[in-house]
Amino acid sequence: MVFNKFVQVGRVVYINYGADKGKLAVIVNIINQNRILIDGEHIVRQVIPIRRVHLTKFQIDNVELNQRTVLLKKKIAKFDLTKKYAETSFAKKQAIKTKRANLGDFDRFRVMVLKKKLARTSAKSK
């Protein structure tokens, strides 16, 4: 299997740490081997360490070096990034994690009861 997720201008990244955690951005410039300049629809243009982002399989074509924010937002909208990203397995797993993290006490109790009921029915069927 060949590695094909390179750090390059136009690559879509998922921010996995910091104030913008969980948001998508696009690499606009590569500063050095550890830092990149990112910009996106819901974040401010900023320098971020590469270790704080997750490279996705998406690459937006025709993104120029230091692309202006307005033009970049148009290209992101044309690419339909949020819809394509929502269909990936990584996005689905992240949605499940956030949903489970936001459960209340009673909701966790209901999940526990349902798991017990499911275990009982599967044990009876054996």
Curated annotation (Swiss-Prot):
Transmembrane regions listed in the UniProt entry: none
Source species, domain of life: Eukaryota
Pfam families reported in the protein's UniProt record: KOW (PF00467), Ribosomal_L14e (PF01929)
CDD domains: eL14
GO terms for biological process, alphabetical: ribosomal large subunit biogenesis; translation
Keyword Ribosomal protein: yes
Annotated keywords: Ribonucleoprotein, Ribosomal protein
GO cellular component: cytosolic large ribosomal subunit
A GO MF label: RNA binding
Keyword Ribonucleoprotein: yes
Family: Belongs to the eukaryotic ribosomal protein eL14 family.
Record-linked PANTHER family: 60S RIBOSOMAL PROTEIN L14, LARGE RIBOSOMAL SUBUNIT PROTEIN EL14
The protein's name: Large ribosomal subunit protein eL14
Organism from which the protein derives: Tetrahymena thermophila (strain SB210)
Organism classification: Eukaryota, Sar, Alveolata, Ciliophora, Intramacronucleata
Gene label: RPL14
